[in-house]
From Swiss-Prot:
Compartments where found: Cytoplasmic vesicle membrane; Cytoplasmic vesicle, Secretory vesicle membrane; Cytoplasmic vesicle, Secretory vesicle, Synaptic vesicle membrane
Compositional bias (Low complexity): 220-241
UniProt source species: Drosophila melanogaster (Fruit fly)
Domain MARVEL residue range list: 30-179
Family, similarity comment: Belongs to the synaptogyrin family.
Name of this chain's protein: Synaptogyrin
Its biological purpose: Required for the correct formation of synaptic vesicles at nerve terminals and has a role in the regulation of the synaptic vesicle exo-endocytic cycle.
Sequence intervals crossing the membrane: 34-54, 81-101, 115-135, 155-175
Protein's UniProt keywords contain Cytoplasm: no
Length: 241
């Protein structure tokens, strides 16, 4: 769990868990990013899957191409399709990680994170289907002549299973990024809400007026001057004889 938490720890202080836009590029730091490491594993697993199936998944039987997965051509085609598109998507998202740190627009980062989360979740499901499909067909198929291609078919099945884990981790990291960005948007929206600013100003103005009223003298200066004149006019004057 500690290793998983370390992998999913992606908050770098910028929008949607990325770094500050315009920062200096460090190749070593970029290569050690959890997103890049997991994408590289997805890329490697995809290469193994479609490489094994395309190289030794087909054989000729009675003048026709025969899929070693119980003769089911769709099984070989589906495994190739999932592997090829996973390979291309992994390279695309690794390039996206390079550009992600340079995206100054929060909306652009949000679109990228949502695309990453959606595609990673979809390809987790696609590899899950591929694992079940290929394993089911292989368990029902007869051993190939001289055992040629059997190792590659088993390897493709195992790496479909590994791909489920790697793509699921990509989806989890993208989901955590999305939560970080959603929390930042909520905080900034609350702080800049005009209604909140108006209420704060109104409360501050009321408090200032109350303090002024309590600190002010009950009688103004002109009234004090009038009282002094009345007192001076009412002073006793000694009569003259």
């Amino acid at each position: 769990m500690d290793m998983l938490n370390q992998i999913l720890s992606i908050n770098n202080g910028g929008a949607y868990g990325g770094g500050k836009a315009g920062g200096a590029f460090d190749p070593l730091t970029f290569a050690m990013k959890p997103q890049v490491v997991i994408r590289a594993l997805c890329w490697l697993f995809s290469v193994v899957v479609f490489g094994c199936i395309s190289s030794e998944g087909w054989t000729e039987k009675d003048g026709k191409e025969y899929c070693l997965y119980n003769g089911d051509g769709m099984a070989c085609k589906y495994g190739n399709m999932v592997g090829v598109f996973g390979f291309l998507a992994s390279m695309g998202f690794m390039g996206g990680e390079f550009l992600f740190e340079r995206m100054s627009s929060v909306k652009s980062r949000k679109r990228y994170v949502m695309a990453d989360m959606g595609f990673s979740a979809l390809w987790t499901f696609m590899y899950f289907v591929a694992f079940l499909y290929l394993w089911s067909q292989w368990s029902s198929s007869a051993p190939p002549p001289l055992g040629i291609g059997a190792g590659s078919m088993k390897t493709a099945i195992w790496f479909c299973l590994f791909s489920i884990v790697s793509w699921a981790l990509c989806a989890l990291m993208a989901y955590k990024r999305f939560l970080i960005g959603a929390g930042d948007e909520f905080t900034s929206a609350f702080e800049t809400d005009p209604a909140n600013v108006v209420h704060q100003q109104a409360y501050g103005y009321s408090m200032d007026n109350d303090n002024d009223q309590y600190s002010a003298s009950p009688f103004g200066q002109p009234q004090q001057g009038g009282m002094e004149q009345q007192q001076s006019g009412m002073e006793y004057q000694q009569p003259t004889y």
